[in-house]
Amino acid sequence: MGKKMEKKRAEMPPARAGILSFWDEEAPGIKIDPDYILYACFAVAVLLIIAHTMAAV
């Protein structure tokens, strides 16, 4: 999979390639699964809905 990522990264502007390095197995440091980002956004949305409901009551 590493080779595919390298090829994709070569075709991208540098900023996007830097963001994608989070997902690459070979990247050192923090490993972030894209699914967790989705779950985090969903959790924030639910919390905002709850907060608005509480404020309205």
Swiss-Prot record:
The keyword Ribosomal protein does not apply. GO terms for biological process: protein transport. GO terms for cellular component: plasma membrane. Its main location: membrane. Residues 54-57 are extracellular. It is found in: Cell membrane. Belongs to the SEC61-beta family. HAMAP family: SecG. Component of the protein translocase complex. Heterotrimer consisting of alpha (SecY), beta (SecG) and gamma (SecE) subunits. Can form oligomers of the heterotrimer. Involved in protein export. The function of the beta subunit is unknown, but it may be involved in stabilization of the trimeric complex. This is Preprotein translocase subunit SecG. The lineage of its organism: Archaea, Methanobacteriati, Methanobacteriota, Methanomada group, Methanopyri. The gene is secG.
